[in-house]
């Protein structure tokens, strides 16, 4: 998409999956202060790992929130739904005009490799891309004691690039920042998603009423030692920037499946 017209202040929508009161989105808003007109629309509660879920059987409500950045208060709404709900509601109902850019984050914890599919943070940015908007997701690769300042600095830099140059239609950026000081970060790397999976199981437990319940547990397994992957970049101290898209067609597989005996006019038993 094209960047905002010269002289126009860009409209930037912020979202996340950690919830509107999470420190990551507050740090993001503060870091982007002054780059344009900021709006925050985010879930009222934590929505980690909800993926691209949307609410279809319950009402979705929005209420105004107090949200401050160094220059003063900015418009903000808490939404009783998922990250994707929040972006949909913002663009269709809450904002008086579409944003020029949607930024989701800063997530507490990485969103690399297969975890992109589970991530509510990435899904908020993906929903924006589906709506035809430029978007990016940004995550800090630290769970326990996150320090968002450096990630915010990189968010600002990459947002400036995105506003200046625009993104290809249907493509968003998935950004992961290593948990290092500004001086320790080696730079930025354009990467691809690493192939990975989870070795999972469920822990069977019993509640006080002696009823069983199950708790998901697992170990992350990296199946890809390529130096150009997001996991490799983070390990080497680089900010990882991965272009991704919601078109999940396996275009490279068309040649392989072209050898199958396709007959568009045949029935399931092969008859005409």
From Swiss-Prot:
InterPro entries: SurE, SurE-like_Pase/nucleotidase, SurE-like_sf. Pfam families: SurE. It catalyses: a ribonucleoside 5'-phosphate + H2O = a ribonucleoside + phosphate. This is 5'-nucleotidase SurE. Belongs to the SurE nucleotidase family. Its main location: cytoplasm. One of its GO terms (cellular component) is cytoplasm. It is found in: Cytoplasm. Keywords: Cytoplasm, Hydrolase, Metal-binding, Nucleotide-binding. Its cofactor is a divalent metal cation. PANTHER family: 5'-NUCLEOTIDASE SURE (PTHR30457), 5'_3'-NUCLEOTIDASE SURE (PTHR30457:SF12). GO terms for molecular function: 3'-nucleotidase activity; 5'-nucleotidase activity; exopolyphosphatase activity; metal ion binding; nucleotide binding. Its EC number is 3.1.3.5. Binds 1 divalent metal cation per subunit. Nucleotidase that shows phosphatase activity on nucleoside 5'-monophosphates. The keyword Nucleotide-binding applies. It comes from the Bacteria.
């Amino acid at each position: 998409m094209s960047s905002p017209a010269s002289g126009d202040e860009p409209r930037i929508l912020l979202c996340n999956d950690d919830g509107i009161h999470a420190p990551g989105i507050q740090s993001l808003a503060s870091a982007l202060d002054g780059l344009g007109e900021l709006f925050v629309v985010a879930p009222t509660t934590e929505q980690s790992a909800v993926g691209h879920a949307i609410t279809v059987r319950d009402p979705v409500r929005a209420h105004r929130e107090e949200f401050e950045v160094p220059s003063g208060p900015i418009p903000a709404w808490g939404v009783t739904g998922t990250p994707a709900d929040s972006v949909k509601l913002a663009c269709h109902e809450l904002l008086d005009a579409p944003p020029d850019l949607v930024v989701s984050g800063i997530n507490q914890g990485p969103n690399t490799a297969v975890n992109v599919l589970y991530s509510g943070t990435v899904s908020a940015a993906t929903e924006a891309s589906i709506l035809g908007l430029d978007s990016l997701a940004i995550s800090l690769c630290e769970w326990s004691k996150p320090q968002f300042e450096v990630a915010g600095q990189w968010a600002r830099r990459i947002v400036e690039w995105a506003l200046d140059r625009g993104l290809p239609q249907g493509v968003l950026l998935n950004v992961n920042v290593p948990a290092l000081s500004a001086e320790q970060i080696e730079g930025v790397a354009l990467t691809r998603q690493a192939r990975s999976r989870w070795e999972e199981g469920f822990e069977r437990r019993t509640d006080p009423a002696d009823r069983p319940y199950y708790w998901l547990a697992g170990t992350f397994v990296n199946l890809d030692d390529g130096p150009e992957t997001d996991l490799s970049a983070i390990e080497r101290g680089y900010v990882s920037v991965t272009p991704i898209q919601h078109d999940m067609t396996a275009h490279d597989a068309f040649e392989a499946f072209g050898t199958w005996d396709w007959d568009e006019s045949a029935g399931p038993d092969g008859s005409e």
